[in-house]
């Protein structure tokens, strides 16, 4: 059998064994994708014993390409929400997550100096303790840039494997300790979160208002400031028994019923100006109008503003809402369309069909992957990661590397959405498939490289000590920030658990947090809020630690 065929066969075996290990759950918690690492260690140990030699060049390529696929698809997935998560609504969560990352780096530095842990080993322990695989890849790359021998760099993968399972356990233990320490009732926390969501967040609502203000009589909608704003859409007007789609030039009269779409605060302001809310239905049932949702798939309209489509002037149709990545938004005239946006249309059937044809509404396109933008994005990401950043006093230039470059580029491209006919939307199923493939390839190679000496290190070497160091790196920041967040901000427990899981970018921990209350989405929401920033910081941190430790000797 050729070297290539042998290497591919062994990698396939590692993936099968590793994914099987990851599916084994104890009390609902398993290693998940991390099981592939231990599958690689298991197969790597026996390959060493049997004298099986694999292609080193091929393994290196597969490891790096797998990492690129993984971080790029993560960036494309979270890109649309990344910059929004940095705004005020998520600022507090991101600050606490930042504190966890920084404190983890400080604990790592202290352990490195106190116990004189070798640089590759301590970076591997750090990456495993925070259960972040891209951090492992970034750390290995900077060590190679520093000129450290490949066999020494591979120690990082072995120490990562030692610390990884106890990193997961440390997160779960922290969640349990915070719950016990503050005597938290999970059901009460879920109710509090639901109440906060209902009362505090600006959700899209609708209201029917009768025009009673005499000052508005015979005024065009575009001349009424509250109605001619980007925060409210008037999608229907009923006059007597006639239901119509109003245009900016439509003249309103006393007694008209208006169907408004917007955020609760804006709708309340409109009610104060226009008149009283009424229970009268403005449903399209029994009329020649209908409401329909269509999806934007036509490359010709990507990047265009809603006002530029002129759907009211050309088709007598109103776009009342815009759904982007699961978030309902007011269809502001200045909003630019992105691939996959869902538009809520109100109008006559024939007119809606015409608008649907204009924007595409080809559901099958949502399941297709445009591969050209994928490789353009990966190529640009690799170039970005290769740009050296020279810092005075540092022995080598810092780089975003093959982990950071594609991630940052994907975040930017995911936020932009499209450039001309190129769109970076990726169907969730395709994104997940590429992401899982990438991480399986990466972890398989890391496990294979670590497997030869893993058992000896655990049984006769310093493996137990490495596990202890890793537990400190995991537990100290999580417990400290978890307790401070609960005491000083009274953070909701489910939100706190999601933030802790997100600060470690740990899906098994998120699964555990979600299972604390099956119907609450609090944990998932906070996890998603901190995940993009933390993933970036986790990739940069081992590089900074490596250069600092190297410089200090």
Curated annotation (Swiss-Prot):
GO molecular function per UniProt: monoatomic cation transmembrane transporter activity
HAMAP family: YidE
Native source organism of the sequence: Enterobacter sp. (strain 638)
Keywords for the protein's UniProt record, in alphabetical order: Cell membrane, Membrane, Repeat, Transmembrane, Transmembrane helix, Transport
Taxonomic superkingdom: Bacteria
GO BP: any one term: potassium ion transport
InterPro entries for this protein: AAE_transporter, RCK_C, RCK_C_sf, Transpt_YidE_put, YidE_YbjL
The protein's name in its UniProt record: Putative transport protein Ent638_0015
GO annotation, cellular component aspect: plasma membrane
Coiled coil spans: none
Keyword check for Translocase: no
Membrane-spanning residues: 4-24, 28-48, 65-85, 95-115, 158-178, 371-391, 403-425, 439-459, 464-484, 493-513, 533-553
Topological type in the membrane: Multi-pass membrane protein
Lineage: Bacteria, Pseudomonadati, Pseudomonadota, Gammaproteobacteria, Enterobacterales
Location of the protein in the cell: Cell membrane
């Amino acid at each position: 059998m050729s070297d290539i065929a042998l290497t591919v066969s062994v990698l396939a075996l590692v993936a099968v064994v590793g994914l099987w290990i990851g599916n084994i759950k104890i009390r609902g918690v398993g290693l998940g994708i991390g099981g592939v690492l231990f599958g690689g260690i298991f197969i790597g140990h026996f390959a060493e014993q049997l004298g099986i030699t694999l292609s080193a060049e091929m393994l290196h390529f597969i490891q790096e390409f797998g990492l690129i696929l993984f971080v790029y698809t993560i960036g494309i997935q979270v890109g649309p929400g990344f910059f929004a998560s940095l705004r005020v609504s998520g600022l507090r969560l991101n600050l606490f997550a930042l504190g966890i990352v920084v404190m983890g780096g400080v604990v790592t530095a202290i352990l490195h100096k106190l116990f004189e842990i070798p640089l590759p080993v301590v970076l591997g322990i750090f990456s495993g303790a925070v259960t972040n695989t891209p951090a492992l890849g970034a750390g290995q790359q900077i060590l190679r840039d520093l000129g450290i021998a490949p066999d020494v760099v591979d120690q990082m993968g072995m120490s990562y494997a030692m610390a990884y399972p106890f990193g997961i356990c440390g997160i779960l233990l922290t969640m349990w300790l915070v719950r016990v320490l503050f005597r938290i009732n999970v059901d009460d926390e879920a109710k509090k979160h639901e109440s906060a969501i209902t009362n505090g967040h600006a959700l899209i609502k609708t209201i029917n208002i009768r025009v009673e203000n005499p000052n508005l009589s015979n005024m065009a909608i575009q001349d009424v400031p509250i109605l001619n704003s980007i925060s409210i859409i008037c999608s229907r007007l009923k006059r007597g028994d006639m239901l119509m789609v109003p245009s900016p030039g439509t003249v309103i009269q006393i007694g008209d019923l208006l169907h408004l779409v917007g955020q609760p605060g804006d709708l309340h302001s409109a009610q104060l100006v226009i008149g009283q809310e009424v229970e009268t239905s403005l449903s399209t049932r029994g009329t020649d109008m209908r409401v329909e949702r269509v999806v934007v798939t036509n490359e010709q309209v990507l990047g265009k503003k809603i006002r530029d489509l002129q759907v009211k002037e050309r088709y007598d149709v109103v776009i009342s809402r815009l759904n982007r990545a699961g978030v309902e938004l007011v269809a502001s005239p200045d909003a630019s369309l992105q691939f996959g946006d869902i538009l809520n249309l109100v109008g006559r059937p024939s007119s809606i069909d015409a608008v649907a044809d204009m924007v595409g509404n080809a559901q099958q396109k949502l399941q297709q992957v445009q591969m050209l933008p994928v490789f353009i994005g990966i190529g640009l990401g690799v170039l970005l990661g290769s740009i050296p950043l020279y810092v005075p006093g540092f022995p080598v230039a810092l780089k975003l590397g093959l982990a950071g470059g594609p991630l940052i580029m994907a975040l930017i491209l995911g936020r932009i959405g499209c450039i001309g006919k190129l769109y970076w939307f990726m169907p969730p199923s395709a994104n997940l498939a590429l992401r899982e493939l990438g991480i399986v390839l990466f972890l398989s190679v890391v496990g294979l490289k670590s497997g030869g000496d893993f058992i000896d290190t655990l049984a006769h070497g310093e493996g137990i000590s490495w596990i202890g160091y890793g537990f400190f790196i995991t537990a100290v920041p999580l417990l400290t920030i978890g307790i401070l967040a609960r005491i000083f901000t009274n953070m909701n427990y489910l939100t706190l658990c999601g933030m802790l899981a997100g600060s470690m970018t740990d899906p098994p921990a998120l699964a555990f947090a979600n299972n604390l209350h099956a119907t609450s989405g609090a944990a998932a929401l906070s996890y998603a809020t901190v995940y993009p920033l933390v993933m970036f910081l986790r990739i940069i941190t081992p590089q900074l630690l490596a250069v600092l430790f190297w410089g200090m000797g």
